């Protein structure tokens, strides 16, 4: 693995499991010093141990990034591990799928706090921490649900579509400072968090409708994020990289 991120300081929110944990591993494998964020100390410690055992560099950031203060503190804590702060991956989310009739204030508020507001507060904090001469990279984890939706996903789809809007607006505003802002849009990826919404029949339909003939993995998504965070994507900003094996824009 090329060490193209050597010495750069990164923060991945929601990195105790799933896409976030795989992303932390991918960035560390490319040489980054990675802040692993989650709410649960045991998840963070396990992820950090996983990275260090593989020869990477990582540190724990146990903060509630659903608040402006929490994500700000997480970024500041990460910045203390190097001479600058370079990469933010806004990955944290809390998801519930409900029909239009079932949506409640508390569910929607929590999803908005973690999946929408935290993205804005994270960008704000990262932009302040990044070196104005060197810039940096921000990658927001959206979803193919922002592009093509399904029943019982009104709140989720709306939030992820909003993340794409935030991404483009932030890219326009921060590009002059050398800060690139992009998003990834994964399709349904098997993780610990998505287990409750999966079943064999639905997975089989998705596989049959996917040109690549399989479900995506957390490593597939992490590779896309690592690319967008790297200098290989130095002239790429305001983009949404769809990581879905082709299912969103094809019909089989």
Region annotations inferred by a language model:
Residues 99-100, 104-112, 206:
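Substrate-binding pocket helix/loop in short-chain dehydrogenase/reductase
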Residues 101, 148-154, 176-177, 213, ...:
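Active-site loop immediately N-terminal to the catalytic Tyr-X3-Lys motif
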Residues 123, 159, 167:
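Active-site helix of classical SDR
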Residues 128, 172-176, 234:
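Alpha-helical segment proximal to the catalytic Tyr-Lys
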Residues 135, 175, 180, 236-238:
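Short, small/polar-rich loop/turn modules that mediate ligand/substrate recognition or access, typified
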Residues 143:
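Residue(s) in the substrate-gating loop at a strand-loop-helix junction
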Residues 148, 226, 237-252:
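Short C-terminal tail/terminal secondary-structure segment
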């Amino acid at each position: 693995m090329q060490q193209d991120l050597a010495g750069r300081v990164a923060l991945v929110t929601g990195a105790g499991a799933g896409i976030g944990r795989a992303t932390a591993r991918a960035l560390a494998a490319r040489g980054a010093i990675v802040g692993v964020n989650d709410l649960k100390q045991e998840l963070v410690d396990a992820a950090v141990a996983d990275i260090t055992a593989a020869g990477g560099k990582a540190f724990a950031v146990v903060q509630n990034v659903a608040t402006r203060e929490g994500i700000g503190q997480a970024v500041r804590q990460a910045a203390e591990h190097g001479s600058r702060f370079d990469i933010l991956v806004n990955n944290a989310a809390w998801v519930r799928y409900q029909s239009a009739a079932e949506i409640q204030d508390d569910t929607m508020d929590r999803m908005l706090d973690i999946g929408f507001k935290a993205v804005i507060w994270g960008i704000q904090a990262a932009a302040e921490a990044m070196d104005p001469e060197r810039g940096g990279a921000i990658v927001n984890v959206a979803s193919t649900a922002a592009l093509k939706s399904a029943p019982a996903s009104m709140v989720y789809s709306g939030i992820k579509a909003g993340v794409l809007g935030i991404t483009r607006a932030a890219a326009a505003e921060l590009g002059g400072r050398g800060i690139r802002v992009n998003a990834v849009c994964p399709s349904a990826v098997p993780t610990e968090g998505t287990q409750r919404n999966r079943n064999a029949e639905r997975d089989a339909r998705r596989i049959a409708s996917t040109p690549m003939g399989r479900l995506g993995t957390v490593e597939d998504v992490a590779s896309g994020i690592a690319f967008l965070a790297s200098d290989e994507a130095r002239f790429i900003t305001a983009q949404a990289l769809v990581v879905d094996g082709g299912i969103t824009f094809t019909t089989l």
